[in-house]
Amino acid sequence: MDAVACIYLLFRRANAFAPDVTPPARLRRWTAAFFAILALGHLWYLPTAVLTSPDAIMLSMLIGGLLDCLTTIPVAIIILFCMLQDRRRPLWPPFVMMLPIIIGLVVCMINCNYDLLPMMRVYMSFLAAGLVIYMVHSVRQYGRWLRDNYADLEHKEVWQSFLVLAAILTMFGIYVSGFGGMAYEYIVQVCGLFLIFYLLWRVETLQTLEQTTPLPDREGLGESLPLSLDEIGQLLQQHCVSTQLYLQHDLSVADLARAIGTNRSYLSQYFSRKNTTYNTYINNLRIDHFVNLYREATTAQRSFTAQQLASDSGYRSYSTFSLAFKQRMGQTVTAWMRESF
């Protein structure tokens, strides 16, 4: 199954889960490598099934653990890094983190002495705790970066993925540690299958955030100009609000900055000084647009649905609109429409 998933990611050009999404190529390649390593992992643990000597079995397990530390664990961490697209993180730290374990395993195999194993388990526990702390901080930082740069967050947020992956990896950790008995062996097999399908889904539904279709600069401005807060506010009113540019799907802060003739840094500073984010600014405009459409439709006694009005207000996903509406208005769409009728 792992090998099939690897071949699928390497050679299939189109997405099966989300055909309209272009996933990060870096994430796709490293996930394919991870599946290839999982497939090979069955081979380097195979001798333990035929060996009878306890010492030989222990040596075989140590060799398998060494290969996992060289490949499986670092590549799994790299996949997590590749999901975060706010910056291009270096990929060598996961390999460096595993060096003490690798050295310890080599020493154990050479000396046929396993006294270092308890210390290595303690190191792995601290390493796992440190990685969790780092990833929680990075995911929170990534969420802020998304809200500062993108109006639409569909196929961009990743925090749910880390919760699911953390649960799956915890099950694997319990199994590898020897706790849990035979029941966990069957559970881990199920988790392994779920991990394959979940990673495939995650890779194919995560939108790459590289700029591919930039908007042209506003005529006559050329390079970005330093502007005051009042000037930026006027330009936003003129080139975003009046033109209803906020209705454009996947409008990024860089797109908007080019449209008004400044750069993203000045525009981000503007939103920061207004104690808001770019995402909140665009969502507020879209919700105001929805309210206007609703009032026009009710006044003219036209038939409509909330889903259609949300789509006309710039939202691809009704669930995203519902969440933004509740955050802005303090109540659900249904409750607001009932009170406004």
Q: What are the residue ranges of the model-derived segments?
A:
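A cytosolic-side transmembrane-helix exit/cap motif
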Residues: 113-117, 140-147, 203-216
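Alpha-helical transmembrane segments and their immediate juxtamembrane interface regions
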Residues: 74-90, 195-214
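Hydrophobic alpha-helical transmembrane segments and immediately flanking/interface helices
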Residues: 55-75, 183-204
